[in-house]
Amino acid sequence: MEVSKIRIHDLPEEERPRERLIKNGPESLSNAELLGIVLRTGSREENVISLCSRILMEYNIKQLSLANVSKLMQVNGIGKAKAAQIAAVFELARRLETFVEEPKRKISSPKDVYTLMYPKMREQKKEKFITLYLDTKNQILKEEVVSIGSLNASIVHPREVFKSALMESSASVIMVHNHPSGDPSPSREDIMVTEKLVEGGKLLGIDILDHIIIGDGRYVSLKDEGFVK
C-alpha cells in the first residue's frame, strides 16, 4: 500500500502524531504533523499527513496563515470545513500576538472585596460561597464558586477550598458568601466554617485573610469581628 494511503489509525500508537505530541510535546512534531492534528482526517486519496505535506509544499507557513477560506479551498482535498479549521487556527495565533493580559485586581481591605463582589451577589436567592485565591501581593489569581445553598461544614469542606489554592500556588485565600435575607450578621454556622477553614489553612501554610459576608448594601468582615486570627 502507498505510504500516502496508510491511515493514521493503522500506524502503531507510538508513531501517531497526536500520541507523540502528548508524550513528547508539540515541538517534537513537524509542521505537517501539527497541521494534521488540526485537520484530523485526510481524503480518500491520501491520509491527513500526506495531505498536509502537500499543502505545505504549495504554501509556506506565512502564506498559509494569510490565505482566506476561498483560497484554501482551491487546494485539492480541502473543503469548507478544513479551510475553516486552518483559518481559525491562524486567527487565534494572530490574536495571541496582540493579547494584553488585564492587570490583576489587588485586594487591600474588606471594602475592596465588598466593592468587587456585591454586584455579583446582591440578586442571589440562595447562599453562594466563593473563594478568592491571592498571590503574595494580594492580587486575585482566581475566583471560584465552592458551593451554593445553606452554608454548613458538610458542604464547604477544606478539601474543596484548598485544592484550587494549591493548584494556583496561592499565598492566601479570602472567603465570601452572601445572606439572601439582607442581614450580613454571621451565624454560628458561618463562624464554625470559618474557624475550620482557618485551621486547615494553617496546616497547609495558606493564610485565610478574611471571610466577608455580604448583605443588602452592607457587609461584615469576620476578621474585623475577631473570628479570623
From Swiss-Prot:
<dbReference type="GO" id="GO:0008237">
    <property type="term" value="F:metallopeptidase activity"/>
</dbReference>
<dbReference type="InterPro" id="IPR046778">
    <property type="entry name" value="UPF0758_N"/>
</dbReference>
<dbReference type="InterPro" id="IPR010994">
    <property type="entry name" value="RuvA_2-like"/>
</dbReference>
<dbReference type="GO" id="GO:0046872">
    <property type="term" value="F:metal ion binding"/>
</dbReference>
<comment type="similarity">
    <text>Belongs to the UPF0758 family.</text>
</comment>
<dbReference type="InterPro" id="IPR001405">
    <property type="entry name" value="UPF0758"/>
</dbReference>
<protein>
    <recommendedName>
        <fullName>UPF0758 protein MM_2791</fullName>
    </recommendedName>
</protein>
<feature type="short sequence motif" description="JAMM motif">
    <location>
        <begin position="177"/>
        <end position="190"/>
    </location>
</feature>
<dbReference type="InterPro" id="IPR037518">
    <property type="entry name" value="MPN"/>
</dbReference>
<keyword id="KW-0378">Hydrolase</keyword>
<dbReference type="Pfam" id="PF20582">
    <property type="entry name" value="UPF0758_N"/>
</dbReference>
<feature type="binding site">
    <location>
        <position position="177"/>
    </location>
    <ligand>
        <name>Zn(2+)</name>
    </ligand>
</feature>
<dbReference type="InterPro" id="IPR025657">
    <property type="entry name" value="RadC_JAB"/>
</dbReference>
<dbReference type="Pfam" id="PF04002">
    <property type="entry name" value="RadC"/>
</dbReference>
<feature type="binding site">
    <location>
        <position position="190"/>
    </location>
    <ligand>
        <name>Zn(2+)</name>
    </ligand>
</feature>
<keyword id="KW-0862">Zinc</keyword>
<keyword id="KW-0645">Protease</keyword>
<dbReference type="InterPro" id="IPR020891">
    <property type="entry name" value="UPF0758_CS"/>
</dbReference>
<keyword id="KW-0482">Metalloprotease</keyword>
<dbReference type="GO" id="GO:0006508">
    <property type="term" value="P:proteolysis"/>
</dbReference>
<keyword id="KW-0479">Metal-binding</keyword>
<feature type="binding site">
    <location>
        <position position="179"/>
    </location>
    <ligand>
        <name>Zn(2+)</name>
    </ligand>
</feature>
<feature type="domain" description="MPN">
    <location>
        <begin position="106"/>
        <end position="228"/>
    </location>
</feature>
